[in-house]
Amino acid sequence: MSEAIINSEQAAQLWPLPDVDLTNLDLFSRGFPHQVFTDLRRHRGALFHPRTALTPDGEGFWVFTRYHDIAAIAKDNDTFSSAGGGDRQGGGTMIEDLPREMGPGSVINMMDDPRHKALRRLIAPAITNARVAAMEDVLFAAAGSAVQAALQQERVDFVSAIAAELPLFAIASLVGIPHDDRHQIFAWINAVLDYSDRQLGETSISSQQGMQNFMAYGHKFVEEKRQNPGSDIVSLAVTGELAKGLGKLTPLEQLMVFSVVMVAGLETTRNAIAGGILAFIHHPDQWLRLQQDGGLMNSALDEILRWTSPTPYNRRTATRDVVIGDRLIRRGEKVTLWWASANRDDTYYEQPFAFDIGRQKNLHMAFGVGGHSCLGAQLARLEMRVILLHLLDQVDGFRLDGDVNWVRSNKHTGIRSMLVRFVKRY
């Protein structure tokens, strides 16, 4: 006898953790709540998060927590859209619907093929592996300067002194942001992404002002690239033509290239670097292991990315009715893919809660999966590597000097500040 098919209303009644609301940002105020998702992974297949007082848009959403389920959905871009679906006016990759002017259908991570694929091809020459490799010397020097300055202090906020400083330098150099503008842009982005004073779907005065200032700067910057283009990623977006007769990018799409490159380039790498050092603080044996065997660097980078999962989830929207297992996901319903949960799934990983820099089987999802995987992955890895190389050469360990101050967000697993004392080698 076949199983009965269950729709979202019925599945909402079966939500296994009635006291847990994944849209309550307090749940994420001390980092990603791994125990909650360990409990959710015990339940096979699709779960439906019921509507609560906090869920945006007055509706619930599907939740996928297991590695293999998430991989399959992330690769099915025809059924699960990054832009939107059904009769929605907005969409995007966050739980809350974003209006069209905020990105869905216009920003690369909220686009669908064929335009998404054509945009990736257009801007990819600005961030090829060869081009990233050519940045190694200058990034190594910049990392060295940041580390040396930090080591002169008795204690330091590792996030602002090192973890944020190199990504800011790297992405600004890649795009061509003037040196004097960099820290102001960083402050605007922080204001937009920090949910310390609001809930999902809400805005605050600081976030509104940050967004307005950031986008106004972006408009001006894009126009300057239109007048004086180079070979950088924004210039390619402004001057280039999409393949297959899709024409030029619209002005909004051009602006969104600037926006997503700056935000993703700063936020994701900063969080991975800071979270990686926190992992080494909690697992000092792994720092010693990496000091003794530099050949573990690549696997260490992958383990840091798996462990930190800087972007915990992405959302898709169903473009048609589809049955997965015994669940009916209907056209227009929200579907969330929790990368951070997949990265601790014991049906894929052996001992997923062990921080093991020599881990061999580690096809982590920190950069996403499928056609929407992160274009800047190699740059992020390079930034992480040059910082670690300097620290490994001069530091035998780290000690926390106070509590870790986490960003209150379910979309970014980030550390706002982290006071650290270095155990210097000499």
PLM feature segments, named:
Residues 1-426:
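Cytochrome P450
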